[in-house]
Swiss-Prot record:
GO biological process, one term: translation
Record has Ribosomal protein as a keyword: yes
Name by which UniProt lists this protein: Large ribosomal subunit protein bL28
Alphabetical list of SUPFAM superfamilies matching this protein: L28p-like
Highest taxon in the source lineage: Bacteria
GO molecular function: structural constituent of ribosome
Annotated S-S bridges: none
Organism: Clostridium beijerinckii (strain ATCC 51743 / NCIMB 8052)
Family membership noted in the UniProt record: Belongs to the bacterial ribosomal protein bL28 family.
Keywords: Ribonucleoprotein, Ribosomal protein
UniProt key word Ribonucleoprotein: yes
Gene Ontology cellular-component annotations: ribonucleoprotein complex; ribosome
Amino acid sequence: MARRCEICDKGVVAGVSYSHSHRQSKRTWAPNIKKVKALVNGTPKTVHVCTRCLRSGKVQRAI
């Protein structure tokens, strides 16, 4: 599944996790992406959208 929102272009972010003893390990944070049917130019199309865009109403769901 895609790791990038097609609406806001939010994607994976890389960083470092620290343990209690301050040892580092590289890791990634991925956005919560859902595959939904949405209206794109008046036609229903399957798009990959983050949950923040779904909740804020930036996407009109196709029923």
